[in-house]
């Protein structure tokens, strides 16, 4: 009897899913979907009816979103690029590679916007077993692919696949280097963050750059920020310091925009079309003294 009830339940659920599936494809092929919003609604209905899971839904939406993004929205900003200079010797190049743990590096001349080429870290391996005096960087460089900030991300992905390269240098309207983009940056827009064996397990949300400046991830909890900087930002409406900054602006600010909140200077150093990513904050001497005093009290 129990087996019969279980069979009937399974049959009913299967029939419901089949009916929804037929309705879904009917809307596709009969041209009922008029815009992107309706398509997104259908995809989310598919998840609720268990035709697809959450990961699949997020990937489909990610594919749709990259068609609306420009390279400037996802690029690594120039300030975060690790460059190698044409006059570096072998030991200096190896030091840069070891510290950064990257596999590809833009190589520049004395003029920062003059890209000589791209160095692959693996191309230095043969020099580890030979005389370092034979090292000559220039012949090792591969041509750099240059793309404008305005290039569509879906076109960029197509070029990565068809031309079989993995990194491109991004330039602004004046030809100055503004960032770089990799195929991984695009794939992360579709499937989420991709961590490899070199990614840090523990993410540092607040990092001191100089006596008065700090790099702060926008996703830092307000409570953690308040504790670090002896501030009193409220967390009733937003949860992160990025939310506080957006609330103060009244809109999603772009990279380079600045604002002062509670006498602390905030500058957006990284952002895309959907969210803030990284901030740089500047504190005064008085605030720094309060921070240091609070640190001393914690230690006591």
Curated annotation (Swiss-Prot):
Pfam families (UniProt xref): CBS (PF00571), CorC_HlyC (PF03471), NMB0537_N (PF21917)
Disulfide bridges in this chain: none
PROSITE patterns in alphabetical order: CBS
Top-level taxonomic group: Bacteria
Residue ranges of domain CBS in the record: 75-134, 140-197
Keywords carried by this UniProt record: CBS domain, Cobalt, Magnesium, Repeat, Transport
PANTHER family reported in the protein's UniProt record: HEMOLYSIN-RELATED, MAGNESIUM AND COBALT EFFLUX PROTEIN CORC
Protein name per the record: Magnesium and cobalt efflux protein CorC
């Amino acid at each position: 009897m129990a087996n019969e009830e279980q069979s009937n339940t399974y049959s009913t659920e299967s029939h419901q899913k089949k009916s929804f599936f037929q309705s879904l494809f009917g809307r596709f092929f009969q041209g009922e979907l008029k815009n992107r919003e309706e398509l997104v609604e259908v995809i989310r209905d598919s998840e609720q009816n268990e035709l697809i899971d959450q990961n699949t839904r997020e990937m489909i939406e990610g594919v749709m979103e990259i068609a609306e993004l420009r390279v400037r929205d996802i690029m690594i900003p120039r300030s975060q690029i690790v460059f190698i200079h044409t006059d570096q010797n072998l030991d200096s190049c190896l030091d840069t590679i070891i510290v950064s743990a990257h596999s590809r590096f833009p190589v520049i001349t004395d003029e920062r916007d003059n890209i000589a080429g791209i160095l692959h870290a693996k191309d230095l391996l043969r020099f580890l077993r030979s005389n370092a005096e034979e090292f000559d960087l220039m012949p090792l460089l591969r041509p750099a692919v240059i793309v404008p900030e305005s290039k569509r991300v879906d076109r960029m992905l197509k070029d990565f696949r068809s031309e079989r390269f993995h990194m491109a240098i991004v330039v602004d309207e004046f030809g100055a280097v503004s960032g770089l983009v990799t195929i991984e940056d695009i794939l992360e827009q579709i499937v989420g963050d991709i961590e490899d064996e070199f990614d840090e397990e523990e993410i540092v949300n607040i990092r001191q750059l100089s006596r008065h400046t700090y790099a702060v991830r926008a996703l830092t909890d307000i409570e953690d920020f308040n504790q670090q900087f002896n501030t009193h930002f409220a967390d009733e409406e937003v949860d992160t310091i990025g939310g506080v900054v957006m609330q103060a602006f009244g809109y999603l600010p772009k990279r380079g925009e600045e604002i002062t909140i509670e006498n602390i200077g905030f500058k957006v150093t990284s952002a895309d079309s959907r969210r803030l990513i990284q901030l740089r904050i500047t504190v005064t001497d008085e605030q720094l003294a309060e921070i240091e005093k609070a640190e001393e009290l914690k230690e006591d």
